[in-house]
Each structure stands twice: as C-alpha cells, then as structure tokens.
Amino acid sequence: MKKVLPVPKEFKPGDRFVAVGTLPLCEGCMLKERCEEYKRGWIYEVKGKVGLVEHDCKVHGKVVMGEVEEVGIPLILPKRLAIEGATVEYTPSKCTNKKCPHWRDCTAPWGERVKVKVREVLEEVQCPLGLPLVRVIGVPVEVKRRTRRNIKKGKGGHGKRGLAP
C-alpha cells in the first residue's frame, strides 16, 4: 500500500528502510502525526518524492514528503518454508538465545499460527544452533485464533476431540 509520508531528504527512489517509530525528540513536531503512520518494524521502499518543501527534523535533519510503499516485515523462517510468493503458517521460534544477532527476526511477536505471505527471500542465516534458516520479507495475511468454543465444535483444527493428531 502506497502512502505519502515524511522521508529523509537524502533518500532516493528505490531506497529501503525499517520504520522505528517516533522518539521523544519528536514531541512538538508538526509532522509527528504523519510519522506515526509508519508501522514500527516494517520495511518501506521510497517510490518517489512528492513535496519540494524541506522540513526540519530533529532526528533526520531535513525531510520531504515522499511516496513510500509497505514492503513487509523482516523475519526468519525454516528453509523449507522460504518460498517466494508462498503463504505459510508462521509460528515464532522458541529460541532463548537473546544474544544471537538473529533472535529478534526469529521470534517476531505476532503470536502463534499467523498466515504470512513470503514477498522476498533475502539470504540464508547462520544459526548458532545449526538450524537451516532463511531471512525473508513477509506480510501477515491472517491470524487464526483457537478458542474453546471452536475446539468444542470441532473447528479447532485438531480432529473431533480437539486434540493433536
């Protein structure tokens, strides 16, 4: 989805960045509300610059209004699921190695059983545990929530008794 939002003046069409959200420095800025439209953690691609007026920014120096497109969220999947264009069921890793440089992308906080469309396969990841993993850009499509009511009705996805097969 394309949006017109503030981008640093030096960004050019095709540049990508990860939105980190607004900072305490942003208090009182006239563009703060526009910057809050960025989804924290998402990758955006600059499609073009729309505005000619440069605005002062305490974080980036100068910004202009630019057309940006949501690309997706960086995450790490098992290699067997990393197929460009595929929609897969994503469950975050239970890894507890918070010192691993890939930990954040392996344990994305979306919850369990999220349908994710793999937009782009980026690279293989060297997992300290030796697991075959790949970094991708994904877009959440649907979240399936198991409720007690669905399990009792047999719609929990685990057979008639609501148990794992």
Curated annotation (Swiss-Prot):
Q: Which cysteines are joined by disulfide bonds?
A: none
Coiled-coil segments:
none
Q: InterPro entries this protein is in?
A: UPF0179 (IPR005369)
This chain's protein is named UPF0179 protein Igni_1272
Q: Which family does it belong to?
A: Belongs to the UPF0179 family.
Species name for this entry? Ignicoccus hospitalis (strain KIN4/I / DSM 18386 / JCM 14125)
Q: Per its UniProt entry, which superkingdom is the organism in?
A: Archaea
